C-alpha cells in the first residue's frame, strides 16, 4: 500500500468540484418580521413594539400594553438570472411567529419578554454545495431558507426609555464519526455505514436601546453579533475490492454557512402629524469578516492515487456596507376600525468584491421598494375584547445587473452577467389578549 498523501484544502482540482458556497443574513433581515415592518422596508428600529420588536429592536417588547401574538406568512419569488438564464434560486416562503408579554412592575417600570420565530415551509435549513468557480448568487442561494429563533427580554421606564437584550440561536454541524465500508465479497457488493453527528448550539447577542426624547420623536439603537453555521465533517471511506483497489480515503470538510455579519444600527421616527409618521434607519454591516471558502482536506491511502495540483483559493475580501431605509405610515382612525397605509424604500450595497479570480460569486447592489396596508379592529366589543391588527405588505427588490470579466491571463474562467428581481408578499395578524 502506498504511503498516505495529503492533498491541501485549497487544492484547485478539488475545490472546483466540491467547495461549499457560504450564504449570508437571514429571512427576517431580507423581508422583515411581520407585514407592518415589511411594508416600511424594515425601518422599525425606533417604532417596533410588541412581537415585531423581538427582531427589529429587543427593547420594544416591554413597550406594549397587552400581551400579543403575531402570526404571518410570506412568499418571495426569486426572479434572478445568470447569463440571461434562470439562476435556479429557490423561492422563499415560510411562517413568522412572534410573542411579547409585558408585565407591569410598579413605579412606572415594565418587564417584557418575547421571541421571534421564522420557519421555512420546505425545510429547517438548507446546505448547498456549489463549485466556487461556477457563477451563483452566494448571498441569496441559502439565506432565505433557514429557521430563525430569537428570544429576548427587556425593561422599560414608562414611555421614555427601554433596554432589551437577547440572542439569535443557531447550531453548528460537527461529526463525531462518519464511516462507510464498501467492497466486494464473493462477487457480492457489500456496504455498511456508521453515523454520529452533533449539533452544538451557537448564540449571537442582541442588544436594543429605545428612547423618546420628545413627544413626537422616538429613537433606537441596536447591535447584533456575528453568527454562522460552522460545518466540521470528517468522512472515512474504507474500500475493499480484492484484486482491484483496497485502502481508505478520509475527507475532511470545514465550512461556514448562513453567515450573518455583526451589525450596528440606529433609527429615528418623527410624528409629523398625529396620524403621520416618518421613519429612517441606518445599519453598518461588518461583511469584512466573511469567512473563507470551504476548507477541504483529503487523505488517500489506496493502491492507486491520482495526482492533484495544489493551489490556494483567494480570501473573499468582502467589504463592510452601510444600508439605508426609509418608511412612512399614515393612520386614519375610524369609529370601530382603524386603517394604516404604509410605504418604504431601502438601499443595500453589495459587499461582494469584483470576481476577477477563481471564485464566481454573483451579486449586485439592491434597491428595495415596499407598500402595504393595515386594518386594526379597534373597538368591536363584545365580539372582540382586544384590538386585532391585520396587515398586508408587498416588496420589490431589484438586484442590479453586473457584467463580471476575469483576468484570464492569470486565472482561467469565463465572463458572466447577473441580476434580476425579488418579489415578496406577506400577510400577518397580531392578536392581543
Located regions from the model:
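Bacterial N-terminal signal peptides that target proteins for export
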Residues: 1-11
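N-terminal signal peptide c-region/cleavage motif recognized by signal peptidases
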Residues: 19-22
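Outer-membrane beta-barrel porins/channels
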Residues: 26-38, 94-433
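Transmembrane beta-strand segments of Gram-negative outer membrane beta-barrel proteins
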Residues: 27-44, 62-77
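Residue-level detector of alpha-helical secondary structure
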Residues: 39, 53-60, 70, 98, ...
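Surface-exposed strand-loop-strand hairpins of Gram-negative outer-membrane beta-barrel proteins
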Residues: 42-47, 77-92, 410, 414
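Outer-membrane beta-barrel pore proteins
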Residues: 45-47, 54-67, 101-107
Amino acid at each position: 500500500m502506498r504511503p498516505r498523501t495529503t492533498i491541501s484544502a485549497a487544492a484547485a482540482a478539488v475545490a472546483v468540484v466540491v467547495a461549499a458556497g457560504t450564504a449570508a443574513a437571514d429571512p427576517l433581515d431580507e423581508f422583515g418580521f411581520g407585514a407592518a415592518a415589511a411594508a416600511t422596508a424594515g425601518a422599525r428600529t425606533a417604532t417596533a413594539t410588541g412581537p415585531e420588536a423581538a427582531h427589529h429592536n429587543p427593547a420594544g417588547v416591554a413597550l406594549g400594553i397587552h400581551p400579543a401574538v403575531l402570526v404571518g406568512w410570506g412568499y418571495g419569488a426569486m426572479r434572478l438570472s445568470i447569463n440571461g438564464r434562470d439562476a435556479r434560486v429557490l423561492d422563499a416562503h415560510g411562517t413568522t411567529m412572534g410573542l411579547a408579554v409585558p408585565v407591569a412592575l410598579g413605579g412606572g417600570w415594565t418587564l417584557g419578554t418575547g421571541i421571534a420565530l421564522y420557519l421555512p415551509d420546505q425545510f429547517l435549513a438548507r446546505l448547498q454545495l456549489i463549485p466556487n468557480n461556477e457563477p451563483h448568487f452566494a448571498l441569496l442561494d441559502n439565506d432565505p431558507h433557514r429557521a430563525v429563533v430569537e428570544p429576548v427580554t427587556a425593561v422599560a421606564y414608562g414611555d421614555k426609555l427601554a433596554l432589551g437584550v437577547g440572542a439569535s440561536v443557531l447550531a453548528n454541524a460537527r461529526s463525531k464519526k462518519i464511516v462507510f465500508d464498501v467492497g466486494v465479497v464473493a462477487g457480492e457488493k457489500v456496504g455498511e455505514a456508521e453515523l454520529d453527528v452533533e449539533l452544538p448550539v451557537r448564540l449571537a447577542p442582541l442588544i436594543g436601546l429605545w428612547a423618546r426624547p420628545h413627544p413626537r420623536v422616538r429613537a433606537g439603537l441596536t447591535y447584533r453579533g456575528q453568527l454562522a453555521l460552522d460545518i466540521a465533517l470528517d468522512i472515512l471511506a474504507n474500500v475493499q475490492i480484492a484484486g482491484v483497489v483496497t485502502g481508505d480515503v478520509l475527507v475532511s470538510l470545514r465550512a461556514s454557512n448562513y453567515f450573518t455579519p455583526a451589525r450596528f444600527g440606529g433609527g429615528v421616527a418623527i410624528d409629523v402629524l398625529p396620524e403621520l409618521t416618518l421613519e429612517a434607519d441606518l445599519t453598518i454591516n461588518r461583511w469584512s469578516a466573511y469567512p473563507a471558502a470551504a476548507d477541504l482536506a483529503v487523505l488517500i491511502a489506496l493502491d492507486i492515487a491520482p495526482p492533484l495540483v495544489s493551489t490556494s483559493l483567494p480570501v473573499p475580501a468582502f467589504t463592510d456596507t452601510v444600508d439605508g431605509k426609509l418608511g412612512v405610515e399614515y393612520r386614519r382612525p375610524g369609529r370601530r376600525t382603524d386603517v394604516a397605509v404604509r410605504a418604504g424604500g431601502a438601499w443595500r450595497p453589495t459587499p461582494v468584491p469584483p470576481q476577477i479570480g477563481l471564485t464566481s460569486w454573483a451579486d449586485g447592489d439592491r434597491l428595495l421598494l415596499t407598500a402595504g396596508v393595515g386594518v386594526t379592529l379597534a373597538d368591536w366589543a363584545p365580539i372582540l375584547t382586544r384590538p386585532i391588527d391585520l396587515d398586508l405588505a408587498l416588496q420589490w427588490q431589484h438586484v442590479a445587473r453586473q457584467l463580471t470579466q476575469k483576468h484570464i491571463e492569470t486565472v482561467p474562467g469565463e465572463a458572466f452577467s447577473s441580476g434580476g428581481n425579488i418579489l415578496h408578499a406577506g400577510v400577518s395578524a397580531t392578536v392581543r389578549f
